Design a protein with these regions (language model features):
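Short, acidic, small-residue-rich periplasmic hinge/interaction motif at the N-terminus
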Residues: 23-87, 95, 125
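Extracytoplasmic beta-strand/coil segments of soluble accessory domains associated
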Residues: 95-136
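Short acidic/polar hinge/loop motifs at secondary-structure boundaries
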Residues: 135-162, 250
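A beta-strand signature from Gram-negative outer-membrane beta-barrel systems
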Residues: 149-190
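Flexible loop and strand-edge segments within Gram-negative outer membrane beta-barrel domains
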Residues: 228-249, 257-316, 322-340
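Membrane-embedded beta-barrel scaffold of Gram-negative outer-membrane proteins
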Residues: 315-329, 447, 455, 489-547
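Gram-negative outer-membrane beta-barrel transporters
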Residues: 415-418, 517-521, 541-626, 704-706
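C-terminal beta-signal and adjacent terminal beta-strands/loops
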Residues: 523, 565, 616-625, 650-707
Length: 707
C-alpha cells in the first residue's frame, strides 16, 4: 500500500514538470489541409493543450490539469476556449461564455427586450464576424439576440481572433471573428444531459447524443429548452427587469468520412417568445405598455471535401448554408414584421506546395433578402383591444432590402519552421448595391526564440448595414426612429494590430504574458446618434472621424498544483463624430477600461473545482442629456465604474457532476435602466441606454450527466 502512494506522488511530480515544460511553447495548429475547410480550420481543443492521458493505478486516478484557453498557433492573433474554460461558469449560452475572458465584453443593449451584444476591441459586436463551424451566421435581425441562440452545452469550443481575420471566410471581419465549434457526430459516443435553474425563475434543459452508425457514418441530435417561469420587478420602476423568455432549439447533424471524401451536414430549428413591458401587478391601468417578440428560425448547412493528395494536403471543398429568420415584434404601439432569408456558398481549393508554402484560393457568393413591414413612427396610441385595428395596419410600410455579393479570394501562407509564419490574402467582391470593392489583409508571426512570439496585422473590412433589422430593438424607445433618406453606405474600416506573447520560466512553472495594441479607423460607419435631436434616434452615414484605440495586457500563472490565476487590464479610447459631423466625442455606453482577475483551483484527484472571477468595469459617457419639462436633467452625462464578482463550485463524479454558483455577487445594478418609466407612451421614455447590470445577485445550481 505504501509503495502505491510513493508511485502516485512520483507520477504527479513528473506530470507537473512536463506541464511546465510543454507550456513554454505555443500550441500546434492543424495543417492547412482538408481539415481547414470541412472539419474545422481552428485547432481542436483536444490537440491544443498539453494533454496527459489518465494513468490508472488500481483505484487511484491521476489527472494532470490542462489549461482552459490556449493561443492560436498561426499568424492571426487569437485564443481558443475549450470546455474546461466553459465549465468554469454556468455558460448557459454563447453570451454567457465570456465571463472569464479578458478580451470580450457582453452587455445588454436595452432593459426591456434582453437584446445583448459582445464588444471586441472596444467596438460593438456588429463588427465581429460571427461563424458557426466556420460558416458565416446570425445576420440582420438575428444580431441583437444571436448570443442566446447558441446553448452553452452544445459547444465544444470557441475560437476568438482579433483584428482583420483570414479573407477565406469573407470581407466582414473588422475587429475580429468568433467561431463556435459545436459538438461533433464523430466525437466519442455518449449521451449528455444538462439541467439548470436559478433564483430568477429561469430553468433550462439540454440533451445531446451521437451514434456511430458505421466506420464512415455518424449522426447526432442536440436539444435545448429554456423558460423564465416568473417575471420580476426588483427595482420597482413598474417594468419587468428582464423579459419573459421561452425557447425551443434543436439540431440534427451528420458526418460521412471516407478515404477521399468527407461530408458534414445538418439542420436546425429555433422558436423563441419574449414578453416584456409593464408589470400588471404594480401598474394599475388599462393602458399597459407591452413588448412581444416571436421568433422562428430555420437553418441548414452542407460541407463537402474532396481530398486529392494526402501528402500535400491538396483538396477541394464546397461549403454552403441557408437560413430563414422570421420575427413578429411589438414595442408598445409600434410593430415590426420581418422575413429574412440568407444563402451562402463557397468553393475552396487548397494545397501545400512544400511544408513551407501553402496556397488557398476560392469563390464565394452571399445573398440576403429582408422582407419588412413596420409602422416605425406611429404616434397615436391605439385604444385598448384595438391594437390590430385597420387604422394601425394602414400605417404599416413595406421596406424590403436585398443584396447579392459574389467574390473571389487568394491567400498565401509561408511557414519557416516555428520561427516565422506570414499570411497575405486579397479578396475582390461585387455588391449588387455598392459595386466592386477590394479587401487586402496581412498577418505575420515571428518567434526569435521559443519563449517569445510577435504578431503584426493589417487589413480592411466591409459590412452592409440593414439598419431597421439590426437596430429594431431601438423601437422600444419613446423617440422617433429615423434612418437617413439617402440610404446607409457600406461600412468600411482599416484595422492594425500588434501583439507580443512571452512564456517566462518562473519558480519551475511558466508565466504566460501577453501585450497587444489595436487601432481601428473607420472610413465610413453607420452612426447611431441620440444627440442631434432629443426627439429622434438617428442613423446616418459618418461625417467626420471614427476610431478605436485598444491596449490590453494579461498574464496567467499556475500558482501551485491545480491552481491557476489570470489577471488582465484593458484600456479603450473609442471616439466618433456625432450631431451630423459637428462633435467628435467618446462613444457613449463604452467603458474606458476593464480589469479582470480569475482564479481556478481543481483538487489533485479532480473531484472538486473552485472558480472565481472579479471584474472592474470602468466608467464612460452617456449620450448628451437634455432638460426635462420639470427643469431636471434627463440623465447624468457620465456613468461611473462598477465591480462584479462571480463564483462557482463543481463536484465531479465518474459520469456526472453538480455545480452551484452565483453571478453579480456584489449586487450592483444600474440605478435607472429605464428613463421615463412612469410614462412609457411619452417621448422621454428611454430603455435603450444600458451600461451596467439590470439585475442584482443571482444564484444557480445545475447537474451535468454523461454516459
Amino acid at each position: 500500500m505504501y509503495s502505491r502512494y510513493i508511485l502516485l506522488s512520483a507520477l504527479l511530480v513528473i506530470g507537473a514538470e512536463t506541464y511546465a515544460k510543454n507550456n513554454k511553447t505555443e500550441v500546434v495548429a492543424l495543417s492547412s489541409s482538408y481539415n481547414n475547410s470541412v472539419e474545422n480550420n481552428s485547432v481542436d481543443s483536444s490537440s491544443q493543450d498539453s494533454i496527459f492521458k489518465d494513468e490508472i493505478l488500481h483505484e487511484v486516478k491521476v489527472v494532470a490539469r490542462k489549461s482552459g484557453t490556449s493561443r492560436l498557433a498561426g499568424a492571426v492573433n487569437g485564443i481558443a476556449v475549450n470546455k474546461d474554460e466553459l465549465f468554469k461558469a454556468a455558460c448557459c449560452n454563447l453570451g454567457e461564455s465570456f465571463t472569464t475572458n479578458p478580451s470580450v465584453d457582453v452587455a445588454y443593449n436595452d432593459a426591456t427586450t434582453g437584446a445583448r451584444q459582445i464588444k471586441l476591441l472596444g467596438l460593438s459586436g456588429t463588427y465581429v464576424q460571427m461563424l458557426t463551424e466556420n460558416l458565416p451566421n446570425f445576420r440582420g435581425a438575428a444580431i441583437p439576440y444571436a448570443l442566446g441562440y447558441v446553448p452553452g452545452p452544445w459547444m465544444k469550443g470557441i475560437q476568438v481572433s482579433k483584428g482583420s481575420a483570414s479573407v477565406k471566410n469573407g470581407y466582414e471581419s473588422i475587429t475580429g471573428q468568433i467561431n463556435v465549434d459545436y459538438l461533433k457526430p464523430e466525437d466519442e459516443q455518449q449521451v449528455e444531459v444538462n439541467l439548470f435553474g436559478d433564483t430568477k425563475s429561469r430553468i433550462e434543459a439540454n440533451a445531446d447524443a451521437n451514434v456511430h452508425l458505421s466506420d464512415k457514418w455518424a449522426t447526432e441530435i442536440l436539444l435545448h429548452h429554456e423558460n423564465i417561469l416568473k417575471n420580476h420587478d426588483d427595482n420597482g420602476d413598474g417594468f419587468y427587469d428582464m423579459p419573459g423568455r421561452e425557447q425551443y432549439n434543436v439540431q440534427n447533424r451528420w458526418l460521412y468520412k471516407g478515404k477521399h471524401y468527407i461530408f458534414h451536414g445538418g439542420l436546425g430549428a429555433l422558436k423563441e417568445i419574449r414578453t416584456s413591458g409593464q408589470d400588471e401587478e404594480h401598474v394599475h391601468s388599462d393602458d399597459i405598455y407591452r413588448i412581444k417578440l416571436h421568433t422562428n428560425r430555420y437553418e441548414g448547412y452542407m460541407k463537402h471535401a474532396f481530398i486529392l493528395n494526402h501528402e500535400h494536403g491538396t483538396n477541394i471543398a464546397f461549403m454552403s448554408s441557408a437560413s430563414m429568420h422570421q420575427l413578429d415584434a411589438q414595442y408598445g404601439n409600434r410593430f415590426y414584421n420581418l422575413n429574412e432569408k440568407n444563402l451562402y456558398g463557397s468553393l475552396i481549393f487548397e494545397t501545400n506546395f512544400t511544408h513551407q508554402h501553402n496556397l488557398s484560393v476560392g469563390l464565394s457568393v452571399n445573398h440576403d433578402y429582408l422582407g419588412q413591414r413596420a409602422n416605425v413612427n406611429v404616434s397615436p396610441r391605439p385604444a385598448v383591444g384595438q391594437e390590430d385595428s385597420p387604422y394601425l395596419l394602414s400605417e404599416m410600410q413595406r421596406m424590403n432590402e436585398k443584396e447579392t455579393t459574389p467574390g473571389a479570394y487568394a491567400q498565401y501562407t509561408y511557414t519557416l519552421g516555428t520561427k516565422l509564419t506570414a499570411m497575405a490574402g486579397v479578396r475582390f467582391d461585387h455588391s449588387s448595391i455598392y459595386g466592386n470593392f477590394f479587401t487586402p489583409r496581412f498577418h505575420v508571426k515571428y518567434s526569435p526564440v521559443d519563449a517569445i512570439s510577435i504578431r503584426l496585422s493589417a487589413g480592411k473590412g466591409y459590412r452592409t448595414v440593414f439598419g431597421l433589422a439590426e437596430y429594431n430593438y431601438l423601437l422600444a424607445s419613446g423617440r422617433e426612429f429615423q434612418i437617413t433618406g439617402d440610404g446607409l453606405k457600406q461600412e468600411e474600416a482599416w484595422n492594425y494590430g500588434m501583439s507580443t506573447a512571452f512564456y517566462i520560466p518562473m519558480f519551475g512553472k511558466t508565466l504566460k504574458l501577453n501585450a497587444e495594441y489595436y487601432y481601428t479607423d473607420f472610413k465610413n460607419q453607420a452612426v447611431v446618434d441620440y444627440d442631434a435631436n432629443k426627439g429622434l434616434i438617428s442613423i446616418y452615414n459618418l461625417m467626420g472621424k471614427s476610431y478605436s484605440h485598444t491596449f490590453q495586457i494579461d498574464a496567467s500563472y499556475p500558482l501551485q498544483k491545480g491552481l491557476e490565476i489570470t489577471a488582465a487590464y484593458r484600456l479603450n479610447d473609442v471616439k466618433c463624430t456625432y450631431d451630423y459631423g459637428k462633435t467628435l466625442k467618446e462613444k457613449p455606453l463604452t467603458s474606458k477600461y476593464k480589469a479582470l482577475f480569475t482564479a481556478s483551483y481543481k483538487t489533485p484527484l479532480g473531484l472538486w473545482q473552485f472558480d472565481a472571477t472579479v471584474q472592474l468595469n470602468g466608467g464612460g459617457s452617456n449620450p448628451e442629456p437634455y432638460q426635462l419639462a420639470d427643469g431636471s436633467q434627463s440623465w447624468s452625462p457620465r456613468f461611473h465604474s462598477f465591480e462584479q464578482v462571480s463564483a462557482q463550485v463543481t463536484r465531479w463524479f465518474r459520469h456526472w457532476s453538480i455545480y452551484v454558483g452565483g453571478e453579480n455577487l456584489t449586487g450592483f445594478k444600474q440605478k435607472t435602466p429605464i428613463y421615463g418609466a412612469s410614462n412609457p407612451w411619452g417621448s422621454d421614455f428611454e430603455p435603450t441606454l444600458v451600461w451596467g447590470p439590470v439585475e442584482g445577485r443571482m444564484f444557480y445550481a445545475g447537474v451535468r450527466v454523461h454516459f
